[in-house]
């Protein structure tokens, strides 16, 4: 039995949409909750890896959610611009809200790194799907 990737995504689109909203809220909660006694500034620390990982997951989730609700592929512009604007928006909110958090350029850099890693994974998954469809159509 062969599984159609797009059919599977569209069949579970309500669940996928819910997971996307949950992922978005977790990122907002994690980045906007009141700050703790973490070290002020280090280039490579746990916080930066969390930023990269969260934005990698969020970009991948954006692409999959887009496919669940739109029959065509997500535009690369959407998969690049939306996460980057989300990350910059979070940093602006950290500077405005009274959460004892402060905006950092390095957070934006690691958000962008995670965005591009998520984009690469999304494109790789699409390529694998396209190749398997080509093989299926040849036989």
PLM features per residue range, with description:
Residues 1-106, 112-139:
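Bulky hydrophobic segments
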């Amino acid at each position: 039995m062969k599984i159609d990737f797009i059919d599977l995504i569209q069949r579970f689109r309500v669940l996928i949409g819910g997971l996307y909203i949950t992922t978005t809220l977790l990122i907002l909660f994690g980045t906007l909750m009141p700050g703790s006694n973490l070290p002020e500034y280090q280039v490579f620390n746990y916080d930066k890896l969390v930023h990269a990982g969260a934005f990698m997951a969020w970009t991948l989730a954006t692409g999959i959610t887009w496919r669940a609700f739109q029959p065509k592929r997500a535009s690369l512009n959407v998969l690049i611009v939306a996460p980057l604007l989300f990350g910059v928006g979070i940093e602006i909110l950290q500077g405005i809200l009274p959460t004892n958090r402060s905006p950092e350029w390095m957070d934006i850099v690691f958000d962008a790194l995670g965005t591009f890693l998520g984009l690469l994974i999304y494109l790789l998954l699409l390529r694998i799907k396209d190749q398997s469809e080509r093989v299926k159509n040849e036989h």
